[in-house]
């Protein structure tokens, strides 16, 4: 199907009504048949509940999205099992994102709206129900970093460090990070760095972190401001 509609080897195919994910399966099969094909896919589907398929409900599928995800998993597994030699490097993985509002509270207020005993409520502008991955992927979107890039995690001094694509972006969102954590992040020679404001016990700690990256990566003052983001 896809080979007949004019798509090229490196195209991204977007299916805005993906249903049971037929498009994803077709692209993976095409990539498996043609080793020069690196087509990617993006599927969009409303999380519509299943109502008229009792057998699917019995198997634990609650929405059309559930069926689509399972189809992608099974199709990828089958493709690799049928052609293990030629599909060893074939990427059949995928990530699932749910559309939501932004990660930040609206803390914009006029001076008249502020009360002295309420100022502490505005110190943290990140919504309380957001986790590290919410913040990480939100920053990736803001920075234009591909959401499909490989990602790793490691724990240093009890704090989790996230590394995207071997250093395209390195992030830590834990509170009061130590010098060892900062050095471990700098050792990755990242292009971009993200911290949460609560990573720092005091403002002086931010300055020390900036200096660490300047020395390790030979960044100028302008590059530090550009490449390090505190949210």
Explain the meaning of each model-derived region.
Residues 2-10, 30-231:
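Accessory, often C-terminal, charged low-complexity segments
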Residues 11-30, 140:
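A phosphate-binding catalytic loop at a beta-strand-loop-alpha-helix junction
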């Amino acid at each position: 199907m896809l080979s007949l509609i004019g798509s090229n080897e490196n195209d991204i195919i977007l299916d805005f009504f993906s249903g049971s994910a037929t498009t994803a399966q077709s692209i993976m099969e095409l990539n498996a048949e043609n080793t020069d094909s690196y087509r990617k896919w993006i599927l969009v589907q409303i999380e519509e509940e299943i109502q008229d398929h009792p057998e699917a409900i019995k198997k634990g599928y609650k929405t059309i999205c559930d069926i689509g995800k399972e189809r992608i998993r099974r199709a990828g597994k089958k493709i690799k099992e049928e052609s293990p030699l030629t599909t060893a490097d074939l990427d059949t993985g995928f990530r699932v994102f749910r559309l939501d509002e932004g990660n930040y509270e609206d803390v914009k207020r006029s001076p008249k709206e502020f009360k002295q005993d309420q100022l502490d409520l505005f110190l943290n502008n990140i919504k309380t129900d957001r986790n590290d991955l919410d913040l990480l992927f939100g920053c990736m979107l803001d920075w234009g970093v591909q959401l499909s890039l490989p990602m790793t995690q490691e724990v240093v001094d009890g704090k989790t460090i996230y590394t995207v694509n071997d250093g395209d972006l390195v992030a830590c969102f834990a509170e009061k990070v130590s010098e060892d954590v900062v050095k471990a992040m700098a050792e990755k020679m990242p292009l971009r760095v993200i911290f949460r404001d609560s990573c720092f016990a005091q403002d002086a700690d931010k300055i020390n972190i900036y200096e660490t990256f300047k020395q390790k990566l030979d960044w100028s003052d302008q590059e530090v401001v550009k490449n390090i983001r505190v949210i």
